[in-house]
């Protein structure tokens, strides 16, 4: 298979742990000829704690499980109505540095939101994407064997209240927002493919294929 090709999988609504395990298995077993993949998924409610995450940032988890992750960053929340995009890229093959990939993912979200006239921006002091001072997208990556995994989570049409149970990404009082505030009918089903197309454009439009999960 042509190495530059990217396979795109729609996984729907899934528990966090099996998808995380599948992502690790994919990364551990891939070689120089394995095509890159992008996974679109929504997760059942879960807090994920980053590799350097501090327990004090998990305030009152209540009935939502807290799962340790090996991505960068602090604690965040995933739930239905949030589009998670995992980027499983061979950075060496694509001649991308880690910082370049972070910038590229942030720009992907900025470009996606611009389609709906939402003026968003990254911040030098806090990874992710913001509208004004409010965070709309979280970002966390891990690199192994020159390949990326984990990715981004864009708030679209969800219950934001669980974010009040944590210090999102380690910032006390960080206000979260979502696309629904500006676009009433936004859904992951609509926004997910747009995110993928914006990312592919920034990767110079490599060949890609949507495949069944």
Swiss-Prot record:
Family note: Belongs to the LipB family.
Other comments on record: In the reaction, the free carboxyl group of octanoic acid is attached via an amide linkage to the epsilon-amino group of a specific lysine residue of lipoyl domains of lipoate-dependent enzymes.
Reaction catalysed by this enzyme: octanoyl-[ACP] + L-lysyl-[protein] = N(6)-octanoyl-L-lysyl-[protein] + holo-[ACP] + H(+)
A Pfam family reported for this protein in Swiss-Prot or TrEMBL: LplA-B_cat
EC numbers: 2.3.1.181
Site feature (Lowers pKa of active site Cys) residues: 135
Main location: cytoplasm
A GO MF term: lipoyl(octanoyl) transferase activity
Native source species: Enterobacter sp. (strain 638)
Compartment list: Cytoplasm
Amino acids binding substrate: 71-78, 138-140, 151-153
Pathway this chain belongs to: Protein modification; protein lipoylation via endogenous pathway; protein N(6)-(lipoyl)lysine from octanoyl-[acyl-carrier-protein]: step 1/2
Name assigned to this protein: Octanoyltransferase
Active site (UniProt): 169 (acyl-thioester intermediate)
Residue ranges of domain BPL/LPL catalytic in the record: 32-207
EC category: transferase
Keywords annotated in UniProt: Acyltransferase, Cytoplasm, Transferase
Function: Catalyzes the transfer of endogenously produced octanoic acid from octanoyl-acyl-carrier-protein onto the lipoyl domains of lipoate-dependent enzymes. Lipoyl-ACP can also act as a substrate although octanoyl-ACP is likely to be the physiological substrate.
Protein's UniProt keywords contain Zinc-finger: no
A GO BP entry: protein modification process
Gene Ontology cellular component annotations, sorted alphabetically: cytoplasm
């Amino acid at each position: 298979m042509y190495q530059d090709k990217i396979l795109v999988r729609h996984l729907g609504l899934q528990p966090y742990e099996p998808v995380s395990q599948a992502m690790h298995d994919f990364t551990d077993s891939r070689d120089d000829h394995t095509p890159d993949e992008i996974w679109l998924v929504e997760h059942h409610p879960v807090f994920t704690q980053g590799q350097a995450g501090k327990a004090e940032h998990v305030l009152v988890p209540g009935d939502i499980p807290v799962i340790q992750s090996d991505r960068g960053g602090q604690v965040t929340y995933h739930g239905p109505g949030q589009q998670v995009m995992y980027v499983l890229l061979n950075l060496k093959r694509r001649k991308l540095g880690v910082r370049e990939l972070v910038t590229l993912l942030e720009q992907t979200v900025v470009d996606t939101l611009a389609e709906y006239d939402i003026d968003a921006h990254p911040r030098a002091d806090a990874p992710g994407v913001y509208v004004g001072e409010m965070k709309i997208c979280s970002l966390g990556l891990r690199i192994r064997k020159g390949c990326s995994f984990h990715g981004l989570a864009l708030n679209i049409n969800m219950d934001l209240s669980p974010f009040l149970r944590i210090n999102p990404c380690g910032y006390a009082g960080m206000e979260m927002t979502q696309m629904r505030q500006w676009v009433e009918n936004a859904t992951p089903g609509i926004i997910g493919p747009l995110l993928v197309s914006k990312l592919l454009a920034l990767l110079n439009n490599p060949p890609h294929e949507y495949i069944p999960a």
